[in-house]
Amino acid sequence: MASTPNSVTLYTDGACSMNPGPGGYGAVILYGDGRREELSAGYKMTTNNRMEIMGAIAALSHLQEPSQVLLYTDSRYMVDAMSKGWAKKWKANGWQRNAKEKAKNPDLWETMLTLCEKHQVTFQWVKAHAGNKENERCDRLAVAAYQNNPNLVDEGFGKF
């Protein structure tokens, strides 16, 4: 990973009404210089896990320069896949989890792995709905994104 003096803290969350169903993600970007940005988007049909990953991808993609990133998420799936090397292993095995089961969401994991080559990312789990101000904000952004007539199409939904 590239070394960088830029320090960024990200909070991300995904939400889905039904699963699958309409979904959204929310992200809060806190830059080391004190700036703050919020991102969100809603999709017509997706899953909660896809929204969790897409929220992180959107936030990481938004960063203009290679950065040292601390990414907080309430998705153990994402934290474990990245921190324990599962996503890299799935990719090395042709997107297979094991001999019988394909890895889910390979399109998103591929993008996440590429972004983690650009940025130094540490994934940190945070308990959902436990009073963490920024995680709660991301949840509100994600829910609002799917409740407000989402019109985006998750191109990878149902393809893998």
Curated annotation (Swiss-Prot):
Matches recorded under Pfam families: RNase_H
Keywords: Cytoplasm, Endonuclease, Hydrolase, Magnesium, Metal-binding, Nuclease
GO cellular component: cytoplasm
Entry EC number(s): 3.1.26.4
Cofactor binding note: Binds 1 Mg(2+) ion per subunit. May bind a second metal ion at a regulatory site, or after substrate binding.
Catalytic reaction annotation: Endonucleolytic cleavage to 5'-phosphomonoester
Residues in RNase H type-1 domain copies: 4-147
Cofactor(s) needed for function: Mg(2+)
One biological process term in Gene Ontology: DNA replication, removal of RNA primer
Location relative to the cell: Cytoplasm
Residues at which Mg(2+) 2 binds: 13, 139
HAMAP family per record: RNase_H
Function, in words: Endonuclease that specifically degrades the RNA of RNA-DNA hybrids.
Subunit structure: Monomer.
Family note: Belongs to the RNase H family.
Protein name in the entry: Ribonuclease HI
